[in-house]
């Protein structure tokens, strides 16, 4: 039974239901209540903590907000600013909101009772903002000078409403103030089950909004990829602010979603979207006889002569079509000799025409998901001027090509990403990318207009749901009290790394059957039934080799409570 149904079931035999407010009806987008003060500045935080301590020491009953702000240390601050921050930081506890709405329709009398220094008008405003229907009454300790924990506020409630203790159910999250305090007044109370306290403000923000997501895919995008996308875009924005004359270009397809998030967070800014790929650029290098750069553009795997020719936008002599060439550990002389025998690609000039039309200038920012900086390398050689790379991650090739002042990296302190990240990187790329086929090349049409050619690719509904969740995170963050607060890189990537190493059954179901492109089309983690592999061990090896999320493959193939992530990483050492 979910929480909403539990509340309605518990309330069925009572005429009236009263609720605690904070952490019951309402949650805040901060890990602890005083975290809101810290968002308002360190000086205010120190003064506000001191003022409340002094106000409580000066009297025995509950204090009011006015009494707190009457302390000399808060003389230069306005209570209205704190009230505005409280209003901005509040979020409905969605299961409780749903229960309150149901109970209202059933004709129950509904009240709230809170130990709080905020005035009742402020609490009413926060409840309205969170979507709660009008309550039949509210009782706040600072109004009456008595608290729940002593039982006296509950007794005052019964006196004011004329209800008997037997008519009322009280629901709250505190055993001491809510359950024990209500019992002192003879009132039945139910302790609201609560999750562990959030680790930080970002976690509180996510937890408060997860119940509002419309599908499992949206929830995954919101909680796992939303913080990463927002944090990366914050970092991009800071770099652009340092050099406002430089334009920001996001690379297709990998940075499609990141560009959407950037525009959500910073709608006033213009950016570019470069529809380029290593494959789309390769014809220009083949035409120029730049064999070393053609090799850099080619995928690092074994391909046939026909596959290499197609990749470079040309045809292969029949006698070379079936020749196998290892591009991961290439024989450079043999490869150069092969490339010399390929005809000049017809589309080579269209490559430079497309780039010329984009208005790229020296020093402009190039935003990429990143590994070895290959696309930046290719573009710089074609454009014949330097760009400034901004990558999400990097491998150990990057610093052999670009210095830190030429290409910056967001994750892992700019160092090569760890094995666990690469174990899930193909999945990350798929989830962030525009859900269209790869950029294959360019065609020059009448009037010199260059048309981009892309591969056919059917839309994947799960990708759309996940990306919708990421966009919803960005919009919610922009409109929240946390907007402007940086999300640290290590905090931003942590949910994704947890998913890669220890996915839940639901995450495996959502993601495992997705496919990725990697010189071919491969499943992320789609094993056949375990029983099939017991009689076909070679098939098991082939399927495992093809899986691009091997930890997920193992967990789906043999669903036992084993640390597959740790086992896989040990095997990779």
Annotate each PLM feature:
Residues 42-51, 73-85, 131-139, 167, ...:
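Short, surface-exposed acidic
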Residues 155, 159-161, 168-171, 179-180, ...:
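Long, low-complexity, Lys/Arg-enriched
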């Amino acid at each position: 039974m979910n929480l909403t149904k539990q509340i309605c079931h518990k309330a069925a035999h009572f005429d009236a239901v009263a609720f605690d407010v904070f952490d019951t009806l309402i949650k805040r987008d901060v890990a602890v209540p005083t975290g809101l003060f810290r968002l308002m500045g360190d000086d205010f935080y120190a003064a506000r903590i001191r003022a409340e301590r002094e106000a409580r020491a000066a009297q025995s009953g509950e204090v009011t907000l006015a009494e707190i702000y009457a302390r000399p240390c808060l003389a230069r601050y306005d209570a209205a600013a704190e009230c505005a921050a409280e209003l901005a930081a509040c979020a409905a506890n969605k299961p409780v909101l749903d229960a309150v709405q149901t109970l209202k329709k059933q004709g129950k009398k509904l009240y709230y009772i809170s130990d709080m220094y905020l005035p009742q008008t402020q609490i009413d405003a926060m409840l309205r903002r969170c979507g709660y229907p009008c309550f039949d009454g509210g009782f706040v300790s600072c109004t009456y000078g008595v608290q729940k924990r002593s039982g006296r506020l509950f007794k005052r409630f019964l006196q004011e409403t004329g209800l008997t203790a037997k008519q009322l159910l009280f629901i709250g999250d505190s055993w001491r103030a809510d359950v024990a305090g209500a019992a002192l007044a003879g009132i039945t109370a139910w302790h609201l089950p609560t999750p562990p306290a959030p680790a930080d403000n970002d976690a509180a923000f996510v937890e408060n909004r997860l119940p509002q997501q419309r599908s499992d895919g949206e929830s995954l995008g919101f909680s796992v990829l939303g913080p990463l996308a927002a944090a990366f875009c914050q970092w991009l924005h800071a770099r652009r602010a340092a050099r406002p004359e430089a334009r920001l270009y996001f690379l297709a397809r990998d940075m499609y979603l990141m560009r959407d998030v950037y525009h959500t967070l910073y709608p006033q800014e213009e950016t570019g979207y470069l529809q380029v790929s290593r494959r789309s650029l390769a014809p220009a290098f083949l035409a120029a006889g730049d064999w070393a750069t053609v090799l850099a553009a080619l995928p690092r795997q074994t391909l046939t002569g026909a596959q290499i020719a197609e990749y470079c936008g040309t045809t292969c002599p029949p006698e070379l079509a079936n020749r196998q060439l290892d591009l991961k550990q290439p024989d450079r002389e043999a490869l150069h000799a092969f490339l010399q025998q390929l005809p000049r690609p017809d589309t080579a000039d269209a490559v430079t025409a497309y780039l010329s039309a984009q208005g790229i200038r020296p020093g402009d920012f190039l935003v990429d998901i990143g590994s070895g900086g290959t696309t930046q390398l290719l573009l710089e050689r074609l454009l014949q001027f330097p760009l400034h790379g901004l990558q999400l991650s990097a491998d150990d090739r990057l610093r052999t090509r670009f210095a830190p002042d030429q290409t910056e990296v967001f994750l892992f302190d700019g160092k090569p990403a760890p094995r666990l990240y690469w174990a899930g990187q193909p999945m990350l790329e798929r989830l962030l990318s525009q859900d269209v086929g790869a950029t294959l090349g360019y065609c020059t049409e009448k009037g010199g207009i260059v048309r981009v050619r892309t591969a056919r690719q059917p839309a994947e509904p799960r990708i759309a749901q996940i990306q919708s969740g990421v966009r919803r995170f960005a919009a919610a963050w922009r409109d929240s009290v946390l907007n402007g607060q940086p999300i640290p890189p290590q905090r931003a990537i942590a949910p994704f790394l947890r998913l890669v190493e220890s996915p839940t059954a639901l995450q495996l179901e959502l993601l495992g059957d997705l496919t990725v492109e990697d010189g071919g089309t491969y499943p992320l983690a789609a094993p056949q039934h375990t029983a099939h592999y017991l009689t076909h061990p070679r098939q098991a090896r082939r399927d495992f080799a093809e899986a691009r999320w091997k930890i997920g493959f193992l967990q789906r193939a043999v669903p036992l409570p084993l640390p597959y992530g740790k086992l896989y990483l040990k095997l990779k050492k």
